[in-house]
A protein has these predicted regions:
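N-terminal beta1-alpha1 cap of cysteine-dependent amidohydrolase-like domains
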Residues: 1-203, 209-253
Length: 253
């Protein structure tokens, strides 16, 4: 509604993007890739399990390399991080994967959180409304420009979003990923847990660990989704300017 566009959603089975599908079902494989290659934007949502994740990574790689707007939610953010680790940082498999997919070793790009004990899935998720602090020198962020941030106790700009996940980016690899251009622009209060990724020189390549849809409303759309749709429609600058103008008007005296 905010963008005044009619949204057309094309569902793609990520398994059909994988090489095995080309051999087993060529028609499904080529249709899936046609849908990805002709999409105005690519969204990889949250989820659990390994099924289809290699195909999701291929879709994320396509978006990253071809300037197609990308939004990764929860697992979708982790997929983008793994793809970047493999294809840009050249971190080998199995390190460049998730403990959710391969738990034989703790040295993984995506690891289980201290709150989560492998093998005990009940009641172990990181849930609820939690702060995400914008990191220094992230003022360039397209996503940040859309948010009306509050200020934390130490004066740092922050947002509040709801979470639902068991796995997170391994902090030991953050510096390596950032050195190649993957920016971790939002973190939790400790600075250890990674909440938001964004590529600077891309029309819109954003991943968030939280679930912004939980707080989205018809007249107050979630900023990650709003930015993604606006970028896909070629009107991100217009929407951002409107948001900035509204924020300025609301803070004027």
């Amino acid at each position: 509604m905010r963008c005044k566009k009619k949204l057309k959603i094309v569902w793609v089975d990520a398994e059909h993007l994988e090489p095995e599908s080309e051999r087993a079902n060529p028609a499904a494989y080529h249709k899936a890739w046609h849908d990805v290659c002709t999409a105005s934007g690519i969204l990889v949502p949250g989820g659990f399990g390994q099924r289809g994740t290699e195909g999701m990574m291929k879709a994320a790689k396509w978006a990253r390399e071809n300037g197609t707007p990308y939004l990764g939610i929860c697992l979708g953010m982790q997929i983008a991080v793994i793809e970047f680790a493999r294809n840009v940082c050249n971190i080998p498999v199995p390190v460049s994967t998730s403990q959710e997919f391969d738990a034989r070793d703790e040295d993984r790009i995506i690891i289980s959180m201290p709150e989560h004990h492998p093998g005990q899935l009940g009641g172990t998720m990181r849930l609820g409304l939690r702060p995400t602090l914008w990191q220094p020198d992230s003022e360039w962020s397209r996503l940040r420009a859309l948010y009306a941030s509050t200020t934390s106790a130490d004066g740092q700009s922050q947002i509040l979003e709801r979470h639902r996940h068991r796995y997170e980016v391994n902090p030991n690899y953050v510096s390596t990923l950032e050195s190649k251009g993957l920016n971790f622009i939002g973190k939790d209060e400790t600075g250890v847990r990674q909440e938001i990724i964004e590529l600077k020189d891309h029309p819109w390549f954003v991943g968030v660990q939280y679930h912004p849809e939980y707080l989205s409303r018809v007249l107050h759309p979630s900023k990650p989704y709003l930015g993604f749709i606006a970028a896909s429609a070629g009107m991100l600058d217009t929407i951002t300017a409107e948001i900035v103008k509204e924020k300025t008007a609301n803070t004027s005296f």
